């Protein structure tokens, strides 16, 4: 027979639980508000010291709490403040999406990382003109260890880009700028970052899926994960694009110092395609970072494979370097996964801290050519690390 409980003691226990719970909730709210204040102060301090014209910052905490910040100016001359929802080019950080689609295809058994690229593209009439074409593997092009030169900084490419600002580029036209060039190094025997790698990868992905890459990205990633502020940067007029600052007629791109001009970007950004190819917000990129590096986009086996880095110098396996569309950095406090990106007028750095389960992305509306960006975005992220440690270290 169950012993009857004392009603007074039960009421006291319930009161105690509710009281402690309310204290904990109040503490969490207080800590969160303090955290937000410190982050905003740090961002404002960098802007006031002239590190960048304007910036947005997106943070997703371990429990999924989303925070969005902004500082400085969307347009300096017109005194238009930056807002958290301001959209900017992701630059090469867009490669993380391309790599994710590739890893989903690996999981489905439709793509083999260690197969030679020739098995997918060898029948193409132009294929034999690619440097190292006989030895390239899928893994090599995804880790930038295949030695393919970069097309994007070639003088003849940037000249044609400016001469034909509305041109829609076919992937093979982009590759043609490196046809018959000497490789950066022997296949698998070095590391050299190259957007050309991801143009080749994009062609392969379209061949496997039978659809254009952006449709596949929408179906597999953007729609399922509700990344509503991320879309292709494949036209000169892009909704929500904030003003960006680049070098005024500075090589290699020779664009106006302030872009877009009357709402129209000076050249068609479509050329970037699978080398980046997206416009987004810092919060969407922070969301994506958390989704990707916490294994929600594909299986743990594929994620483990993605996160195996190749040394930035030797191109051989190391404890930090470049994985399959991801940069892996080893720091005293732990690892960082992520990717940087630049497109004329804009820079992006997405970072995920597995130790704390926190994703951080910063975007600024200036690039290194502009003279208005002082320091690296990795450095800006580094300034936030002590704040993250203060609030989230266990």
Identify the function of each model-found stretch.
Residues 368-394:
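Short, gly/Ser/Thr-rich active-site loops of penicillin-recognizing serine hydrolases
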Residues 24-26:
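Boundary at the C-terminal end of the N-terminal hydrophobic targeting segment
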Residues 73-75, 128-340:
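Short, surface-exposed loop or secondary-structure junction motifs
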Residues 32-88, 334:
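Short, conserved catalytic-motif segment at the N-terminal edge
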Residues 3-13:
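Bacterial N-terminal signal peptides that target proteins for export
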């Amino acid at each position: 027979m169950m012993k009857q409980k004392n009603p007074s003691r039960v009421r006291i226990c319930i009161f105690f639980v509710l009281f402690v719970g309310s204290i904990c909730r109040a503490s969490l709210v207080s800590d969160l508000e303090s955290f937000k204040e410190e982050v905003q102060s740090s961002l404002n301090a960098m802007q006031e010291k002239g590190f960048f014209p304007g910036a947005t910052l997106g943070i997703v905490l371990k429990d999924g709490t989303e925070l969005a910040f902004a500082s400085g100016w969307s347009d300096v001359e017109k005194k238009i403040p930056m807002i958290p929802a301001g959209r900017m080019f992701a630059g090469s950080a867009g490669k993380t999406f391309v790599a994710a689609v590739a890893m989903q295809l690996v999981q489905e058994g439709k793509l083999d990382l260690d197969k030679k690229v020739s098995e997918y593209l060898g029948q193409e009439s132009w294929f034999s003109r690619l440097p190292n074409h006989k030895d390239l593997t899928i893994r090599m092009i995804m880790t930038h260890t295949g030695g393919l030169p970069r097309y994007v900084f070639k003088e003849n490419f940037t000249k044609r880009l400016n001469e034909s600002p509305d041109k829609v580029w076919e992937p093979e036209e982009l590759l043609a700028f490196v046809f018959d060039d000497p490789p950066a190094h022997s296949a698998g025997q070095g590391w050299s970052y190259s957007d050309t790698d991801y143009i080749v990868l994009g062609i392969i992905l379209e061949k496997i899926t039978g659809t254009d890459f952006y449709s596949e990205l929408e179906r597999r990633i953007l729609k399922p994960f509700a990344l509503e502020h991320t879309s292709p940067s494949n036209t000169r007029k892009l909704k929500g694009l904030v003003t960006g600052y680049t070098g005024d007629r500075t090589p290699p791109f020779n664009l106006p110092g302030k872009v877009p001009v009357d709402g129209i970007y000076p050249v068609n950004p479509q050329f970037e395609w699978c080398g980046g190819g997206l416009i987004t917000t810092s919060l969407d990129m922070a969301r994506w970072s958390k989704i990707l590096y916490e294994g929600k986009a594909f299986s743990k086996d594929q994620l483990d494979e993605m996160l195996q880095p190749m040394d930035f110098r030797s191109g051989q396996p190391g404890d930090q370097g470049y994985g399959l569309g991801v940069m892996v950095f080893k720091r005293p406090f732990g690892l960082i996964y992520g990717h940087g990106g630049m497109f004329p007028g804009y820079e992006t750095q997405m970072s995920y801290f597995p130790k704390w389960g926190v994703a951080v992305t910063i975007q600024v509306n200036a690039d290194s050519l502009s003279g208005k960006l002082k320091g690296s975005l990795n450095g800006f992220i580094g300034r936030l690390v002590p704040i993250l440690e203060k609030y989230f270290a266990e």
